[in-house]
């Protein structure tokens, strides 16, 4: 991959992204039919559209965009020393600056929408004390992506204990947590697209314990400006009452409402190939209504 990255960095920008477009089309061709059915089914069940053809278009667009994402990452050696600034535009950056000045840390919540890898790299390169909490992947893939993350001054830690995360928050760190995927049995059951859905409770739990804000930061590529728009959203604070479970559920519901609204705004940007209701269906399928299991 590093050889391919070096080759990409030698090419004109237009050719770089033409290759990205080709890679995205190839990726869609390689997606198994049952995974395509899953993506299309979830789009329909979430009422993004009621037209199967439009659902297929959205599913394809949400997959082919990975070609451009890959090119953005492969360009890290080319953009790491400040050239990335020409690729992005910040909206409402003051929310991050206020949290940084406060010095008490923050939870930066993100979703698998747009180029979340570039988002983390840009925030770290801009001097924000970001620690991205990730899941460990394949050894070779991990080695490559972490080496490239370091090019953008990004620090990544694998999913770790609450105590370690709290220690980082006490140092004033921004903990980056992606919270839109199926958390398995670690989640809390709250509404999402009209269905009770297991959802990651980590952001609400940590924010409540340390009384720090949860700040959603999103990224969307605008074909009109030719830039990635990094939008920082108003901070969310967890209400602290005597009922801890209620506080976490209420806040996680608010977070899901934000994610749902954002996905409806940019449906082609989200990762529809992910089986979002897999564990909800497995644990609660006979007790509550869930989207039909189309992944067969």
Model-identified regions with their sequence ranges:
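Short Gly/charged-rich anion-binding patches and loops
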Residues: 3, 38, 94, 118, ...
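Short, flexible segments with low predicted structural confidence
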Residues: 14-15, 71-72, 120-121, 141, ...
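Catalytic core of membrane glycerolipid acyltransferases/transacylases, capturing the structured
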Residues: 102-160, 182-188, 221, 225
């Amino acid at each position: 991959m590093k050889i391919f990255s070096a080759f990409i960095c030698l090419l004109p920008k237009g050719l770089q992204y033409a290759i990205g477009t080709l890679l995205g089309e190839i990726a869609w061709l390689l997606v198994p039919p049952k995974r395509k059915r899953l993506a299309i089914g979830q789009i329909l069940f979430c009422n993004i559209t009621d037209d199967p053809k439009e659902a297929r278009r959205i599913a394809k667009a949400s997959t082919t965009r990975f070609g451009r994402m890959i090119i953005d990452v492969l360009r890290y050696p080319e953009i790491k020393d400040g050239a990335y600034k020409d690729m992005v535009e910040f909206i409402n950056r003051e929310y991050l600056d206020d949290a940084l000045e406060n010095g008490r840390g923050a939870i930066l919540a993100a979703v698998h929408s747009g180029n979340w890898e570039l988002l983390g790299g840009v925030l770290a390169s801009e001097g924000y004390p970001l620690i991205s909490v990730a899941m460990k992947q394949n050894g070779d893939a991990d080695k490559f992506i972490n080496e490239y993350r370091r090019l953008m001054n990004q620090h990544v830690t694998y999913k770790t204990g609450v105590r370690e995360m709290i220690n980082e928050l006490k140092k004033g760190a921004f903990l980056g947590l992606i919270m839109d995927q199926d958390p398995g049995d670690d989640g809390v059951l709250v509404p999402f697209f009209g269905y009770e859905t297991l959802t990651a409770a980590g952001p609400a739990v940590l924010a409540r314990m340390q009384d720090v804000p949860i700040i959603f930061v999103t990224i969307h590529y605008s074909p009109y400006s030719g830039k990635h728009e990094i939008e920082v959203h108003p901070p969310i604070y967890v209400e602290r009452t005597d009922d801890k479970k209620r506080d976490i559920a209420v806040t996680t519901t608010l977070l899901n409402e934000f994610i749902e609204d954002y996905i409806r705004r940019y449906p082609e940007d989200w990762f529809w190939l992910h089986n979002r209701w897999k564990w909800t269906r497995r644990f609660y399928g006979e007790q509550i209504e869930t989207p039909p299991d189309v992944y067969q």
